From Swiss-Prot:
This is Histidinol-phosphate aminotransferase. It is an enzyme of class 2 (transferase). Coiled coil: none annotated. Homodimer. Pathway: Amino-acid biosynthesis; L-histidine biosynthesis; L-histidine from 5-phospho-alpha-D-ribose 1-diphosphate: step 7/9. GO terms for molecular function: histidinol-phosphate transaminase activity; pyridoxal phosphate binding. The gene is hisC. Its EC number is 2.6.1.9. PROSITE patterns: AA_TRANSFER_CLASS_2.
């Protein structure tokens, strides 16, 4: 018997595509997911595993991971009651969106921005207010404030630094938005360690409607561990945490986080390398004919080329995997790639020079 299974499901699923990574996740030079090029050193992994094997594997972890939460709160110098740890910042986005949105409620998102924001808004049947970026891919702060006020939005989500553009909002402009909008304001700081702008964290003391999101997947090189944090006023975090999945963070994730925070020089050294390599590669790309690089506040660069699809395919043919972000608003013929190891950056640059010269 034939049945239309969609009639059993949330009708919003018709408007949502499954998440996918064009080109896959395997390549000789993998630069498409904004990962750190550095894995943890083996001596640190050994210390983490040595502690983890002494944990009881037959017992559930804590409902909320208090050890990891306290470790990160102490690292930031904020009260642990104002910090929520999750299984990656994406899990926390699900949690926060569930807490804030539903049918009839409005969310404002700059466009383009991280694709998960729109997906979650559609899934929760909220009304989406898109505010286009400027042609330079910078945020249009005045338009954000005006739209938030005119549309009476309930929720404003700002990716700063922004994925996929690499641009940041200034500290003062975030203050303007938080003070001008009668809405919860979420600042997703996944790439803040690479930014020229200051974090919005100090504004939490000033604005009870502000939440800052952090991930350990980028600067801390823990993408495989799935660790993220939301930081806000304790009374706000207590409410936002209500729809959170219990037991979502593993003991291994907590132990790993604590060891990395105790050895944070590893992170600062990696960030220093990435910043220097980013600026060096940006400067070299300026001299490549037919390639327009954009300044970045992240661990990745965006370039515009005459034909992004063709360049993307030719790079794959050379074993180099980047991200084709041409489908985003204002980003026609744009490619995105994270900073890799020195040899990877050199091979990418050489490939772009060769492709631009007409070589296959």
């Amino acid at each position: 018997m034939q049945r239309d299974i969609m009639r059993y499901l949330n009708p919003s699923l018709r408007d949502i595509a499954a998440y996918s990574v064009e080109g896959g996740q395997q390549a000789a030079i993998k630069l498409n997911q904004n990962e750190s090029p550095f894995d943890l050193p083996m001596w640190l992994k050994d210390a983490i595993v040595s502690e983890f094997v002494r944990e009881p594997w037959n017992r559930y972890p804590d409902i909320l991971p208090y050890r990891g939460t306290k470790a990160y709160a102490d690292f930031l110098g904020v009260p642990a009651e104002g910090v929520m740890m999750g299984n990656g910042s994406n899990e926390l986005l699900y949690t926060i969106f569930l807490a804030c949105l539903g049918p009839g409620r409005k969310i404002l998102v700059p466009d383009p921005s991280f694709s998960l924001y729109e997906k979650l808004a559609l899934l929760l049947q909220a009304s989406l207010v898109r505010v286009p970026l400027k042609a330079s891919l910078d945020f249009d702060v005045d338009a954000i404030i005006q739209s938030a006020q005119e549309e009476s939005v309930d929720f404003v989500v700002l990716s700063s630094p922004n994925n996929p553009t690499g641009k940041s909002i200034t500290f003062d402009d975030i203050r303007r938005i938080a003070s001008s909008c009668d809405a919860l304001v979420l600042v997703d700081e996944a790439y803040i360690e690479f930014s020229r702008q200051d974090s919005a964290l100090p504004l939490i003391e000033e604005f009870p409607n502000l939440v800052v999101l952090r991930t350990m997947s980028k600067a801390l090189a823990l993408a495989g561990m799935r660790i993220g944090f939301a930081i806000g006023r304790p009374e706000l975090i207590a409410e936002i945490a209500k729809p959170k999945i219990p037991f979502a963070s593993s003991r291994l994730a907590e132990i790993t986080l604590m060891h990395v925070l105790e050895n944070y020089a590893i992170v600062t050294d990696a960030v220093s390398y990435i910043l220097n390599a980013r600026d060096e590669l940006y400067g070299e790309l300026l001299s490549v004919q037919g390639v327009e690089p954009f300044m970045s506040d992240t661990n990745f660069l965006v370039i515009r080329v005459p034909d992004a699809d063709a360049v993307f395919r030719k790079l794959i043919g050379r074993g180099i995997l980047v991200r084709n972000v041409s489908g985003y608003h204002l980003m026609k013929n744009c490619l995105r790639f994270n900073i890799g190891l020195p040899d990877e950056n050199s091979r990418l640059l050489d490939a772009l020079l060769a492709i631009n010269g007409g070589m296959a």
